[in-house]
């Protein structure tokens, strides 16, 4: 198992949890972004900078991910592509996307996009809180234990 991170939108506190997990377990962790990302010196952790552009980082993750790999992303369409390739997708809030729930999440995302396009302000998600961080760490530990 390798861990791929959609790093352009990944909160710093989640990155720190991932850094510690990679050091502890020795699993390969790659942060993919269209800007430079600082990573601690480690043989298990690296960053991959891609060119700027719409979905460039997402497309690079999809190109590189293999069955059984884990992708950290809040991007629902990216999560769907990862699942289709046999990977696991986990949001920074600790929500595990699966074959069983990704369709409903894609539908909700599309519905919210339609609302925003029609001028209805739906607001963004609330700030990441301690409960979210704990849910992420717990789900990450469960996935790493299964590898």
Swiss-Prot record:
Domain of life: Bacteria
Annotated InterPro entries: UPF0178
One Pfam family matching this protein: DUF188
Family: Belongs to the UPF0178 family.
PANTHER family: UPF0178 PROTEIN YAII
UniProt name for this protein: UPF0178 protein Tgr7_2584
Organism expressing this protein natively: Thioalkalivibrio sulfidiphilus (strain HL-EbGR7)
């Amino acid at each position: 198992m390798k861990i791929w991170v959609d790093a352009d939108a990944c909160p710093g506190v989640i990155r720190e949890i991932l850094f510690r997990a990679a050091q502890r377990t020795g699993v390969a962790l790659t942060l993919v972004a269209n800007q430079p990302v600082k990573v601690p010196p480690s043989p298990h952790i690296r960053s991959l900078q891609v060119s700027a552009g719409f979905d460039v980082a997402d497309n690079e993750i999809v190109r590189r991910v293999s069955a059984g790999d884990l992708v950290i992303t809040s991007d629902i369409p990216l999560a769907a592509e990862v699942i289709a390739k046999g990977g696991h997708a986990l949001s920074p809030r600790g929500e595990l996307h699966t074959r069983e729930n990704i369709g409903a999440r894609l539908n909700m995302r599309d519905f919210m996009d339609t609302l925003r396009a029609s001028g209805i302000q739906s607001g963004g998600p609330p700030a990441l809180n301690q409960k979210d961080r704990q849910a992420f760490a717990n789900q990450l530990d469960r996935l790493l234990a299964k590898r």
